[in-house]
């Protein structure tokens, strides 16, 4: 009985929950139909002088979603209302506050790479949340922001929002993943104020759509949108990779993902246009750097990776073949992409100096390349090879595993059951390393099966073989949307697990999942 009581008390200390939003008068483009006042995310009293006296969490609440004590604590809140009542608008206010806190904390932080965050103007509201048994408040009044953490009952301690308090605030903070697949959501042009105040707009959305900051800022929105639009083809390709990995991993653990469907056959085919297509997109998405400079660095990294994997790669493909060139290009491109995304790699490559040398002219840049880039490339590759369990380097290790397997088939099929028996993956990362790299186009055939009869791989396989078979693309739009959303969440959660504390980042121990327009 004592151990159970200790578990309950420990759960209270580790618990995280959003308490609510206190709104003041705001521009209509921000508040929309929302009125001023208190919007609790549960049965919580209204704040008085910036403080809420919270009742202790009951055993019923603490145990509601806990199957095992070793699993995370879960708290669920729902926002219910008619169309146009302000449900999404309320979440928008929360996202704006979280974005602005990130902006204030990170703007002055001494990091080689600055996330492309922009301030969301027009907010006059407070966000209350509880973390590790303490009440916290983020106060946002236009450009003025304050942060308070409960020191003891009834007493709130102000913590200045500055880069100096980055670790103190974020080490007990939460990471928010907002999911909304509505075609009309998060269109930045809908966030432009009609009043003369042109500072209120939707430009802030661009900085939080895609995680290219190594999970530095504690907020991301999915799926990725460019100028309010979702690239369906790109989303399909990314979702295909995630769902393939999750479904096979589920099968290996005698579970199904998605529920009631089991992967049967994985097909693959190399994309001989991969290098041309990827290089074009990479240069376009990194337009702040000169294209020729990027190509030169990729070339040097190709040469360096060739010394590591060239002999093995020659056993698979002819040196002059497209296939050989695609594999080396992918490893070099992925390495450079890591260097332009993560601060510690950015520093090793010394991208700023690289830009200076390039701007000085061809002679200066060529001399710098010849003298220093080979040694720098060696350091970068060594760092990559010393980080086999990091989500940052996962795709490079996937490519290394592919080379070491010695499989030179350009297309083919593999039964998922055989894949599982051969590699016996225990984790998502383990499994991904054995799947085909992104320069292959893959597809997976699912079978619909009777879940009650599926207890283990061997006993279920005959059942699966006799079931209806179809590709992921043939699932209903509703099923695909649910799968895409969940695969996004699981992907980010997996990555967050591998984030270690360093000079630039803190690991997040609490996660806030927001499913807007969930009925879609």
What residues fall within each predicted segment?
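Switch/communication elements of ASCE P-loop NTPase nucleotide-binding domains
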Residues: 14, 18-100, 456-520
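Generic detector of bulky aromatic hydrophobic side chains
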Residues: 101, 105, 118-129, 135-137, ...
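Generic alpha-helical propensity signal that fires on short helical segments
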Residues: 97, 108-109, 192, 237-245, ...
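Short, glycine/acidic-rich hinge or "gate" loops at secondary-structure transitions
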Residues: 106-117, 192-204, 498-507
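Short, flexible coil/linker segments at or flanking structured domains
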Residues: 9, 29, 67, 115, ...
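Coupling/switch/interface segments within P-loop NTPase motor domains and analogous charged loops
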Residues: 1-20, 118-121, 126-133, 137-467
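Generic alpha-helix signal with a bias toward terminal, lower-confidence helices
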Residues: 51-53, 106, 186, 231-235, ...
């Amino acid at each position: 009985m004592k151990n159970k009581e200790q578990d309950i008390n420990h759960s209270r200390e580790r618990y995280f929950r959003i308490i609510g939003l206190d709104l003041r008068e705001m521009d209509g483009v921000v508040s929309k139909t929302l009125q001023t006042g208190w919007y609790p995310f549960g049965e919580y009293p209204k704040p008085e002088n910036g403080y809420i006296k919270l009742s202790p969490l009951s055993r019923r609440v603490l145990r509601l979603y806990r199957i095992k004590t070793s699993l995370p604590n879960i708290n669920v809140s729902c926002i219910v209302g008619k169309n146009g009542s302000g449900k999404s608008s309320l979440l928008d206010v929360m996202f704006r506050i979280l974005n602005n806190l990130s902006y204030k904390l990170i703007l002055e932080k001494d990091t080689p790479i600055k996330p492309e965050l922009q301030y969301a103007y027009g907010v006059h509201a407070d966000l209350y949340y509880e973390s590790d048994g303490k009440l916290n408040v983020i106060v946002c009044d236009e450009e003025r922001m304050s942060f308070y953490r409960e020191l003891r009952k009834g007493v709130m301690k102000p913590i200045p929002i500055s880069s100096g308090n980055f670790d103190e605030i974020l080490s007990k903070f939460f990471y928010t993943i907002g999911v909304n697949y509505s075609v009309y959501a998060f269109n930045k042009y809908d966030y432009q104020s009609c009043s003369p105040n042109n500072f209120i707009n939707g430009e802030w959305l661009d900085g939080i759509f895609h995680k290219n900051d190594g999970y530095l800022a504690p907020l991301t929105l999915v799926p990725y949108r460019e100028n309010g639009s979702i690239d369906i083809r790109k989303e399909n390709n990314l979702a295909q990779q995630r769902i393939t990995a999750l479904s096979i991993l589920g099968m290996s653990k005698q579970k199904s993902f998605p529920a009631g469907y089991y992967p049967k056959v994985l097909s693959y085919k190399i994309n001989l246009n991969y290098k041309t297509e990827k290089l074009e997109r990479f240069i376009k998405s990194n337009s702040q750097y000169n294209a020729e400079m990027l190509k030169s660095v990729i070339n040097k990294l190709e040469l360096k990776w060739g010394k590591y994997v060239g002999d093995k790669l020659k056993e698979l493909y002819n040196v002059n073949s497209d296939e050989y060139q695609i594999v080396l290009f992918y490893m070099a491109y992925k390495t450079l992409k890591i260097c332009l995304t993560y601060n510690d790699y950015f520093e090793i490559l010394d991208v700023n100096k690289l830009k200076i040398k390039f701007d000085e002219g061809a002679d200066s840049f060529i001399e710098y390349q010849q003298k220093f880039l080979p040694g720098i490339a060696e350091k970068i590759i060594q760092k990559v090879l010393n980080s086999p369990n990091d989500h940052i380097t996962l795709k490079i290790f996937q490519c290394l595993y592919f080379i070491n397997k010695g499989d030179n088939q350009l297309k083919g099929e593999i039964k998922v059951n055989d894949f599982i028996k051969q590699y016996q993956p225990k984790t998502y990362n383990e499994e991904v390393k054995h799947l085909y790299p992104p320069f292959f186009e893959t597809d997976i055939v699912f079978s619909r099966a009777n879940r009650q009869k599926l207890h283990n791989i061997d006993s279920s396989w005959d059942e699966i073989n006799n079931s209806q078979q179809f590709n992921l693309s043939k699932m209903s739009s509703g099923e695909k949307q649910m799968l895409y959303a969940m695969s996004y969440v699981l992907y980010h959660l997996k990555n967050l697990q591998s984030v270690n504390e360093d000079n630039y980042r803190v690991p997040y121990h609490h996660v806030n999942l927001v499913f807007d327009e969930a009925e879609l």
